[in-house]
């Protein structure tokens, strides 16, 4: 089951006014504690630092999250939160490497990744694990 964190702790109140960072972590924790594979996704390019992304990864791992997707935030319209930066492919690769080193089973990290990116591959991974 996926519950997207969307962004790092500092930026959450700016882009998710109806959601709290800690509440989202608790949702992930409850999913994982139920024995269900927990997945989350975040957008980068909102002004976060790599250190904040790593802190978010640590929080997700402590909550039991096993799959992480990381994609570039794209401003849907001029009324929405602006893009602070376009993250480089090298930084996306670094996020993937860091996430795997932190213990995520799977990390998809690239500019056009969305939370459903390669979902069929993720399902197949866990089907193999349960046989």
PLM feature spans:
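Auxiliary Fe-S-binding modules of radical SAM enzymes
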Residues: 25-37, 44-131
């Amino acid at each position: 089951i996926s519950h997207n964190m969307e962004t790092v702790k500092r930026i959450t109140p700016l882009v998710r006014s109806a959601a709290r960072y800690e509440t989202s972590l608790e949702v992930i924790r409850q999913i994982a504690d139920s024995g269900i594979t927990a997945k989350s996704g975040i957008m980068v390019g909102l002004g976060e630092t790599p250190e904040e992304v790593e802190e978010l990864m640590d929080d997700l791992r402590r909550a039991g999250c096993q799959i992480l997707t990381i994609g570039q935030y794209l401003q849907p319209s001029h009324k929405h939160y602006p893009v602070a930066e376009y993250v480089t492919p090298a930084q996306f690769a670094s996020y993937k490497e860091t996430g795997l080193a932190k213990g995520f089973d799977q990390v998809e990290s690239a500019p056009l990744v969305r939370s459903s990116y390669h979902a069929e591959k993720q399902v197949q991974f866990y089907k193999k694990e349960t046989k």
